[in-house]
């Protein structure tokens, strides 16, 4: 039985399960597979390398699915010339994308662009936030849906270290817009828990990285299946730019350098280890120890590499069973002997 939440109604999807845009693996193929399975797949446009290549990838995504999909625009600080974010945004608008996910820095400027340009064809906006404080700001800016990312998440979990058991409950207290629970979500029991806490659905990243449709090499996926919930590293904490990645040889080196340098730690100390060029080379070579790559604590709940359809079916079935059987049974009176 499909779940009926504010998210499913607003986005026109069957299941309240999103796969947010991700660096490297947020491809049209993965987004289409998630959307075709009844969720919302999101293509990360910056993966294309340029706005015009992004345009072609959006068109290719449209050829792969007739279901709703989203496009991610992540705005991050840059040590060199920043990416052409406004050009990416214009491509998204010109290609008639209906759902946009933003992440990173404040989306205010781009929200204005999307709202102004969409006219009658309203663009639904989702923004990833790592705290209720940031989520409330996003609501004021006019974001339609909040992706509330707990400390368990891959990538950038923020600096406040609030896990989802508290964060989602606070979201339910404070937010008026629909929101999804993001970070560490890999199972249907967690979907049921998120709904119980007040979320309207879940966003899964790491879980969909370990699928057949993800473009990551098998060596990465194998390490995820073998991994435990303790096999991630928080790096760059001293720079207030915390990032959660898989615990491999490179991540361990970064962790050791950061610890040894203490208050004198500087990004230059590890730039040669964490730069994107090295990470991309490791991915292309299938070397799971060659560079850093993101993974959330949910890897401890991943034990196979199924298709996106199988992930979706299993999560929905588990969530329904948890609610109908496990939770309802706790309220049923027991016979007394």
Q: Residues of each region from the PLM?
A:
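Conserved active-site-proximal phosphate/metal-binding subdomains
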Residues: 158-180, 186-337
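Active-site metal-binding loops of divalent metal-dependent hydrolases
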Residues: 22, 184-185
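Active-site entrance/lid segments in N-terminal catalytic domains of soluble metabolic enzymes
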Residues: 1-175
């Amino acid at each position: 039985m499909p779940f009926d939440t504010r998210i499913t109604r607003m986005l026109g999807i069957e299941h309240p399960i999103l796969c947010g845009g991700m660096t490297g693996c947020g491809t049209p193929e993965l987004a289409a597979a998630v959307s075709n399975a009844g969720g919302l797949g999101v293509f990360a446009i910056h993966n294309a390398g340029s706005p015009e290549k992004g345009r072609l990838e959006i068109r290719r995504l449209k050829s792969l699915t007739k279901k709703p999909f989203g496009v991610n625009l992540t705005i991050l600080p840059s040590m060199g010339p920043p990416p052409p974010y406004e050009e990416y945004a214009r491509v998204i608008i010109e290609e008639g994308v209906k759902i946009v996910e933003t992440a990173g820095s404040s989306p205010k400027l781009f929200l204005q662009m999307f709202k102004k340009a969409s006219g009658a064809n309203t663009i639904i906006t989702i923004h990833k936030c790592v705290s209720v404080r940031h989520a409330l700001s996003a609501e004021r800016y006019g974001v339609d849906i909040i992706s509330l990312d707990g400390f368990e998440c891959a990538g950038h979990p923020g600096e406040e270290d609030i896990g989802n058991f508290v964060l989602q409950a606070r979201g339910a207290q404070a937010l008026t817009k629909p929101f999804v629970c993001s970070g560490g979500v890999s199972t249907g029991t967690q979907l049921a828990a998120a709904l119980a806490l007040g979320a309207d659905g879940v966003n899964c990243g790491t879980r969909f990285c370990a699928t057949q449709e993800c473009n990551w090499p098998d060596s990465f996926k194998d390490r995820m299946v073998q991994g435990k919930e303790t096999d991630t590293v928080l790096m760059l904490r001293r720079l207030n730019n915390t990032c959660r990645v898989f615990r491999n040889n490179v991540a361990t080196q970064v962790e050791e350098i950061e610890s040894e340098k203490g208050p004198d730690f500087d990004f230059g100390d590890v730039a040669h280890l964490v730069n994107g060029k090295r990470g991309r080379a490791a991915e292309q070579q299938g070397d799971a120890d060659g560079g850093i790559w993101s993974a959330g604590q949910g890897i401890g709940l991943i034990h196979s590499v199924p298709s996106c359809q199988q992930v979706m079916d299993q999560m929905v079935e588990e969530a329904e069973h948890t609610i109908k059987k496990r939770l309802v049974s706790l309220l049923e009176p027991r016979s007394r002997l």
